[in-house]
């Protein structure tokens, strides 16, 4: 008997796929389409187990849908721009382009060795001119619409990577790539007006029925829509006003001070003549701007000489520069009510600012102790003049009416989300296609001159971008007036590229951004990736899709119908990482056990949404199962050569039992496939093989039927072995283009059933009965059974409880 030689099987199968262009996909209106997509990887150079799991999930889905008769698009590409490649190139003294292309070639070969069914004819790399040309074109369209703009902005500055970070890219006060403490810095930045789409992005979350609730909740919170009042505080002895937004106007009469951001114009003006304030502002620049960090870091402030007038009471109120107020939120000022806001209370305690209680509890029994903490619940107004006695709802309306009539405030809908800063001060990215002219200002490059090519022959350093030092790149003529001008040297945030790549896969060679194929394939039917992308990539991609829709490029409102967020791969309870020394190299596993084993383990060890704990014994178990599958085929290959068909009238009792088990497991597997519960699909395969092995006298036709069902269920998981056996057993040419098995409902109709017999709730017998018996007939047979009679003779049968074809309980006394 032949041994399971996974190496030869996998090589020959991959060669078959290559020769036959098996995975190439074209538009076919006669079939239902299915677009399956896993998030494109950064080409780091080597695959890790997280990659293997993520892309195996996508491949299993794509193969299953293809076997369901659908026209499946399953593409792959590379998120190739960005700092990691630039930093690696500096370290290894190579150009980022050369480094990236070398990594892509190697990773592609690793993907192929795992048997992934990617249509490589649609491959894209975001660093290729043919790709980024069209995002430059799109940016120009957005600029013309006023959806892209440039302004000075206080940004998160990474002093190591020498670039700006979006708020989402700052983790615990540090740069997500470098780990450096982030600083605040004001520089000119390009932005996209995502705030113009905030309402629609929020509303359309309701359309995402097949997204995880956790992701939807994160996006809802990140967009952060809230209704409140903007209140105007007049600066004393000045014509200026400070506007603040509040969702709690019922606490307005309790304002004890205003807090302004360190970058607020009034703070900067006073700092010119106050060295202590200037030093405090410098200190604030070195602290985190992330909300999570602001909530936990020490509250610090500096009392200014500025005073404002309360809009209702006309009291004079102090203004403090506070490290917890962000210039990027609202007007960079907040009203502070220490008695009713915990953060304000902590600040007031530190600086001995008095408290004024203006809300009391609806519950008279509740004791409010402002010495211990703020009272933050809604209640009844007190110490609020004409508004005393009002509840929150009535106070909101009354104070809104007063402020509006006095021109001292107005109702506002506010969003937590802010416009997306898309420019980065690094080299390895897509050049922003803008030109700066002294006479004309910022002017877009002429569309016929696109793409603005990124120079590849550059001297890289760790300090910022070299583009500003390349005369032939930076010195250009103004597209409008023709005078000497300067090209923009900032490049796009890499999230710009990854926000539309899924659409370009539909028409990767089109001489336009998207063509009609986009509307055939979009939206993506199944999208697979990590939950860590919930509020960056997934939100930006939704935004981009709506921008493309409004440009007439796509017709759908949302890019991804169904989202699957896979769990991490752990070893010893921790995420695999070089620093922890717990990395498992997939290539070593492929060499030792074969790609099919690695794929099978990654799908069987845990449900896809949960973390997978690495286990060498689990891998060995997967390999052992595949050897059993191979050995069964070897032992029975003579049977398959006979071309046997199933004849139901010739089936034995044993055949019928086996077919019941096989088709029951097939039915469960189809249900679990559709729910993406792949671990239980693999379990069904194991049960079918056990069934085939456990019955000694199965008809040859049942063996053929059962094993062909097993191979087709297993094929999406272990495509090499199943392809090989399908051909070797003369079942067909290519299992991938074979229809998925259909449940035979006749096989699920049992001639007999096993009945559990209880007496007074205790198990006494198990009887095999004819499935055609009525309830009364079942009762008669059970009561007449000699073994059962031994328990009930000379006893009174009080009642008989029958659960059809499962259980009967005889109550006696």
UniProtKB/Swiss-Prot annotation:
Binding-site residues, ATP: 578
Superkingdom of origin organism: Bacteria
Motif 'HIGH' region positions after renumbering to this chain: 41-51
Gene Ontology MF: a single term: aminoacyl-tRNA deacylase activity
Keyword Protein biosynthesis: yes
Enzyme Commission identifier(s): 6.1.1.4
Reactions the enzyme catalyzes: tRNA(Leu) + L-leucine + ATP = L-leucyl-tRNA(Leu) + AMP + diphosphate
GO BP annotation list: leucyl-tRNA aminoacylation
Motif extent ('KMSKS' region): 575-579
InterPro entries named in the record: aa-tRNA-synth_I_CS, aa-tRNA-synth_Ia, Leu-tRNA-ligase, Leu_tRNA-synth_edit, M/V/L/I-tRNA-synth_anticd-bd, Methionyl/Leucyl_tRNA_Synth, Rossmann-like_a/b/a_fold, tRNAsynth_Ia_anticodon-bd
Compartments, record wording: Cytoplasm
GO cellular component: cytosol
Protein family (similarity comment): Belongs to the class-I aminoacyl-tRNA synthetase family.
PANTHER family in the cross-refs: LEUCINE--TRNA LIGASE, MITOCHONDRIAL (PTHR43740:SF2), LEUCYL-TRNA SYNTHETASE (PTHR43740)
HAMAP family to which the protein is assigned, alphabetical: Leu_tRNA_synth_B (MF_00049_B)
Record protein name field: Leucine--tRNA ligase
Lineage of producing organism: Bacteria, Pseudomonadati, Pseudomonadota, Gammaproteobacteria, Thiotrichales
Name of the coding gene: leuS
